[in-house]
């Protein structure tokens, strides 16, 4: 196996005052199944793009590998899927296509359908298979789970576990645990490489933080004690100096004064050393402040009621018949495979032009806050976006700061935000809305793990009435009080 090495890697986006990487150094083996983790905006996708040679940088980034990036664009998507695969990996023999796709749960007939007619999950699996069908390429896989249902994530995780050598960006904890054997984390103070899965890395990271917190507390007490001792020594020294006036044994007094001055210097040196050590601690601690939400109470006990509900796409039934009720304080997870009508049901609740039969009843005057999957509508200034929705600007920006966005980020065009940062904007705006019901469609796509944990804690503590779609199993199990299966 060969190595990928960075030595003094430095990179900034044009016009940005802060570098994404400054003198970064790391070394990784191309035989590793490497998980790349870090908060949104920390530079995960940027690092992949640097490896692809798309950006100019300072320092050295050395590798003999030829890299392939996922997701890759598909020109002429109206062509048959088999033709798309032939173009992406011309050296692969045709019989390998159905074999590889079967490992990902894709039927062979998908090869003879236009690529454009495949579901988002099927497209993801086809493009992933192409990565490993190409010879002599090292895969760089950026967020493959965003369009995959729970079963699809399990299949892709098992598929990647069979492979050898790739870099994977993902924020799904269980998905990472299932398929990686090393972690490269982009921390606040630099880059760390560690063997093991994500949970192993997180346990070690937390252990190190606890150790540093304990050391920080001991040093804080030491500094306080040394300052008090220095103050006493200074007071004693002043008194001794004063006693020299008219003292009979001036040699004795001078010797005593010199000893105290020496002790004072020693205390000052120890204090400075303790402060230096203290300054080197906790540089990687992520400050994840608690979020707050105050949902509105509704006079009706039941917020949503469906009876024999069926959703139709033309003459095809997408889902149903479906019967359920959602009471105040319940957080219901909509569960079903890709294409089962989950997003359509949410849009129907919002009054969208969705054809349905059966009964759907919402409580009178029900106010709904919605987080869509798609972030493409976010453009222009953040302040203008907040004001356009009639929201409290200060509160919304305070939430975004808690979710890890810097104040400098607020001045940038929303179109230049990373996908994870855009999702944080949508979630922050939803949390600022006064609503009886929160409807969130795959809110965690592209969202970093720290933000996921913050949102988990918020929803468990504030207990809003909620209907959501989310394929992150750990999040769903932590948040949902009931599951509605389509």
Question: Language-model segments: which ranges?
Answer:
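ABC ATP-binding cassette signature C-motif
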Residues: 1-212, 298-486
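Extended, highly charged alpha-helical segments
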Residues: 76-79, 83-100, 178, 185-287
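Intrinsically disordered, low-complexity boundary segments flanking structured domains
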Residues: 56, 134, 274-278, 293
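Short, highly charged low-complexity linear segments
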Residues: 61-63, 233-243, 264-265, 282-291, ...
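Coiled-coil termination/hinge junctions
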Residues: 279-304
